[in-house]
Amino acid sequence: MAASSISSPWGKHVFKAILMVLVALILLHSALAQSRRDFAPPGQQKREAPVDVLTQIGRSVRGTLDAWIGPETMHLVSESSSQVLWAISSAISVAFFALSGIAAQLLNALGLAGDYLAQGLKLSPGQVQTFLLWGAGALVVYWLLSLLLGLVLALLGRILWGLKLVIFLAGFVALMRSVPDPSTRALLLLALLILYALLSRLTGSRASGAQLEAKVRGLERQVEELRWRQRRAAKGARSVEEE
């Protein structure tokens, strides 16, 4: 029971991490392809861009998903998401063009080169789509790095706890063997215990806070469930009294 309760959160985290890695690779692959088409100079748009590592990984992930889900289903999902993303990008592009015109008029009224300064706000739908894809990929990578960092810190916390216990036991044994005077032994043992308690407090404060927050959330769910049961019992009693 304990092993299953410990391994199930780790399994969920690993599954989420793998899923988010696949999503991040697909988004980065789409963003790379889109950015080459929209931000490349006019003379270089017709040339075939060199295939980099991210593009190769994205293609391999796409091939794996085609094998798992099916090419038709994957093509349907890709086309639907592309249409939705293109509609959103077109709306944002129209808004940026309108904002560019307003900013240009205001800057021209102030005596500045408004048309030149507001030129950067005129983004095509493809460019907006590229920004959205890269932004989504960056958010996914940030979430993935946060998850991996949390797992690494949790693992390091357990390793440090074991190392701290081993050092304390070694110091205790060395203290008992090397110090014959009982008073000096008691003082050194007290100092060792204080040091161990301080290290436990410093290393376990974050973990204890997270555990306390999880316990509070569990208690809140239990309270809500009890309230729901009380309301249901009260409604049942009222219906019985009415009958």
Curated annotation (Swiss-Prot):
Reaction equations catalysed: K(+)(in) = K(+)(out); Ca(2+)(in) = Ca(2+)(out)
Traced from the root, the source organism's taxonomic lineage reads: Eukaryota, Metazoa, Chordata, Craniata, Vertebrata
GO CC field: extracellular exosome; monoatomic ion channel complex; nuclear outer membrane; sarcoplasmic reticulum membrane
Provide the gene name from the record: TMEM109
Per the record, what ranges lie on the membrane's Cytoplasmic side?
A: 105-135, 206-243
Q: Which UniProt keywords apply?
A: Endoplasmic reticulum, Ion channel, Ion transport, Membrane, Nucleus, Sarcoplasmic reticulum, Signal, Transmembrane, Transmembrane helix, Transport, Voltage-gated channel
Specify the protein's topology with respect to the membrane.
Multi-pass membrane protein
Ranges facing Lumenal side: 34-83, 157-185
- Intracellular or extracellular location(s): Nucleus outer membrane; Endoplasmic reticulum membrane; Sarcoplasmic reticulum membrane
Q: What does this protein do?
A: Functions as a voltage-gated monoatomic cation channel permeable to both potassium and calcium. Plays a role in the cellular response to DNA damage.
- Record's InterPro entries? TMEM109
Q: Which terms does the UniProt entry file under GO BP?
A: cellular response to gamma radiation; intrinsic apoptotic signaling pathway in response to DNA damage by p53 class mediator; negative regulation of programmed cell death
- The signal sequence is 1-33
GO molecular function, a single term: voltage-gated monoatomic cation channel activity
* Name of the protein in its database record: Voltage-gated monoatomic cation channel TMEM109
Q: What is its main location?
A: nucleus
What species is given as this protein's source?
Homo sapiens
Mind telling me which residue stretches traverse the membrane in this protein? 84-104, 136-156, 186-205
Q: How does it assemble?
A: Homooligomer. Interacts with CRYAB; in the cellular response to DNA damage.
